[in-house]
């Protein structure tokens, strides 16, 4: 399924324009964590610094966040995964997103993805990987998120004004326990706190490389549920199956 972007004239315009230097930033995180609001403030900071950002918003069924970004005067495209995993959809559309960003003569492509699975970390190796997480999800949330957080370069913590200082400190320690190498930014999607710091990291992020690879392997292979099987219980399913006690088996040819 191709990305559905804003009208851009000739479909072939700009293709193969790989000579232009371009940075890629992938922003993922838990639903409702404030990814879009934080990113909008970061876009404003990048614009003030003279950079030309472009945004691709990946969502599941519906979004109007593209209208919010359009008000900032930046190129924006939308991709709806629909019946597919939004992170998988984002991963295999990276080439189209980069082509589109070059057509827009952007300096940096900001890819905001839905990040619903948590186990599917959509970060290529040649990007700045940003995980946005909501502190109100509880002190142990960073330990539950998985590769979405553990392979991120930057973890942006939102809604810190809704909890105590002690809770924020515990949350921070849990993040570092899961990912000791990451940078942590405390952000506020309403006031814009932390946006300038995030924009500075984006400016210093890596340029897009050739033959990019994912930082972490995806979950186990496709099962019959992925291909549309509706019946419950293992007797109706094939592929790699995991039991409640952790035992794994392969069922099928």
Regions found by a protein language model. Name each.
Residues 57, 79, 112, 130-135, ...:
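Conserved beta-strand segments of the P-loop GTPase G domain that flank and frequently precede/overlap
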Residues 1-28:
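Extreme N-terminal, non-catalytic leader segments
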Residues 119-136, 147-151:
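Inter-motif core of Ras-like GTPase G domains
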Residues 22-33, 37-124:
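Nucleotide-state-sensitive switch-loop elements of NTP-binding domains
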Residues 162-214:
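Canonical P-loop GTPase G-domain recognition
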Residues 60-63, 115-116, 136-139, 160-164, ...:
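Conserved nucleotide-binding/hydrolysis micro-motifs of P-loop NTPases
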Residues 23, 27-32, 44-47, 210-253:
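P-loop NTP-binding site
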Residues 118-123, 140-143, 164-168:
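Conserved ATPase-coupling elements of RecA-like P-loop NTPase cores
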């Amino acid at each position: 399924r191709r990305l559905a972007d804003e009208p851009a004239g000739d479909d072939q315009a700009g293709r193969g324009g790989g000579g232009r230097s371009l940075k890629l930033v992938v922003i993922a995180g838990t639903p409702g964590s404030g990814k879009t609001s934080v990113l909008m403030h970061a876009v404003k900071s990048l614009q003030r610094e003279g950079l030309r950002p472009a945004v691709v918003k990946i969502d599941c069924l519906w979004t109007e966040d593209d209208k919010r970004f359009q008000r900032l005067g930046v190129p924006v495209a939308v991709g709806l995964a629909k019946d597919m995993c939004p992170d998988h959809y984002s991963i295999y559309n990276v080439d189209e997103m980069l082509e589109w960003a070059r057509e827009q003569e952007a300096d940096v492509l900001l890819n905001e993805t839905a990040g619903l699975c948590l186990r599917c970390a959509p970060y290529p190796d040649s990007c700045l990987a940003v995980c946005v997480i909501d502190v109100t999800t509880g002190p142990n949330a960073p330990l539950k998120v998985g590769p979405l957080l553990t392979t991120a370069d930057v973890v942006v913590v939102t809604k810190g004004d809704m909890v105590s200082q002690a809770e924020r400190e515990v949350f921070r320690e849990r993040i570092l326990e899961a990912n000791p190498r990451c940078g942590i930014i405390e952000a506020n999607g309403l006031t814009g706190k932390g946006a300038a710091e995030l924009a500075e990291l984006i400016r210093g992020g890596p340029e897009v490389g050739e033959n990019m690879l994912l930082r972490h392997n995806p979950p186990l292979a496709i099962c019959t549920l992925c291909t549309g099987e509706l019946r419950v219980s293992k007797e109706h399913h094939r592929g790699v199956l995991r039991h409640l006690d952790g035992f794994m088996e392969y069922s099928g040819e």
